Structures are given as structure tokens and as C-alpha cells.
UniProtKB/Swiss-Prot annotation:
The protein's assembly and partners: Part of the ribosomal stalk of the 50S ribosomal subunit. Interacts with L10 and the large rRNA to form the base of the stalk. L10 forms an elongated spine to which L12 dimers bind in a sequential fashion forming a multimeric L10(L12)X complex.
Any one of the GO BP annotations: translation
Keywords: Methylation, Ribonucleoprotein, Ribosomal protein, RNA-binding, rRNA-binding
InterPro entries assigned: Ribosomal_uL11, Ribosomal_uL11_bac-typ, Ribosomal_uL11_C, Ribosomal_uL11_C_sf, Ribosomal_uL11_N, Ribosomal_uL11_N_sf
Name listed for the protein in its UniProt record: Large ribosomal subunit protein uL11
Presence of keyword rRNA-binding: yes
Family note: Belongs to the universal ribosomal protein uL11 family.
Gene: rplK
A GO term, aspect molecular function: large ribosomal subunit rRNA binding
Modification after translation (UniProt): One or more lysine residues are methylated.
rRNA-binding among keywords: yes
PANTHER family: 60S RIBOSOMAL PROTEIN L12, LARGE RIBOSOMAL SUBUNIT PROTEIN UL11M
Function: Forms part of the ribosomal stalk which helps the ribosome interact with GTP-bound translation factors.
Length: 140
């Protein structure tokens, strides 16, 4: 018999830096999950991606066990890193904060492909280029 799923928890945590403080502790604690066990497992799985923000989907079960799936970093984080900017523009249509090449956009699209709804690479490239435009980053 399959375990009874009681919740799906979505978080974005710094790779290799999960700890019991908010937002991780309260999110897991309210479902009765072992916070330290999750933190150790997450940090072990993401230690090679230090410095990146990693989205994670945690599935909590009725017997207080859990499983989790890590996803690729958000496109906005990858674009900001490629353009060497701290954050996107507050006025993306007026003020440009940086630029990326089409090759960099293609690399990000290839990396993000499993998490995007695009059917093929050109569609994924358009999605990433749109994200760049909405952040005030020029695509050259």
C-alpha cells in the first residue's frame, strides 16, 4: 500500500546552506517532519551547486517521512549571474541593468529545459529571453 501524502511544500533554499531557521524550520515543522534530517540530505545533494538558489519540492507523508525533488535554479538567478548584476531593473523598459549574449541564453535554456514547459530548444530560448527582457537585461 502506498504512503498517504499529506502535503507538498515548495521552497527556494540556498544550495548547501539549508538550516532549521525560517523558512525551512516552520514549513517542515508544521507537518511534523524531521527538520535536521532534511537539512543534512538537502545540503549533501546540493553541495556542488554552492551559491545558487535551488527550488525544492518536499512531499510529506502521514507517517512523518518525506521525499524531496530539487529543481534547476530559477532563470532569473541564472540570468543575473550571466549578466553580472545583483538584481533586475525596477523599470525594465526604461532602465537596462546589463546584457547577455544569445549563446548565454541558449546555455541557460539547455540547463532549464527539464523544468520548462517548452517543447523544444527554440521555445525554451524564447522563454529565457523573455525573462531577461522583463528583468531589464538586453539580449544581444
Amino acid at each position: 500500500m502506498a504512503k498517504k501524502e499529506i502535503a507538498k511544500i515548495k521552497l527556494q533554499i540556498q544550495a548547501g546552506a539549508a538550516n532549521p531557521s525560517p523558512p525551512v524550520g516552520p514549513a517542515l515543522g508544521q507537518h511534523g517532519l524531521n527538520i535536521m534530517e532534511f537539512c543534512k540530505a538537502f545540503n549533501a545533494r546540493t553541495q556542488d551547486q554552492k551559491g545558487m538558489v535551488i527550488p525544492v519540492v518536499i512531499t510529506a507523508y502521514a507517517d512523518r517521512s518525506f521525499t524531496f525533488i530539487t529543481k534547476t535554479p530559477p532563470a532569473s538567478v541564472l540570468l543575473a549571474k550571466a549578466a553580472k548584476v545583483a538584481k533586475g531593473s525596477g523599470e525594465p523598459n526604461k532602465t537596462k541593468v546589463g546584457s547577455v549574449t544569445m549563446e548565454q541564453v541558449e546555455e541557460i535554456a539547455k540547463l532549464k529545459m527539464p523544468d520548462l514547459s517548452a517543447k523544444d530548444l527554440p521555445g525554451a530560448v524564447k522563454t529565457i529571453a523573455g525573462t531577461a527582457r522583463s528583468m531589464g537585461i538586453d539580449v544581444k
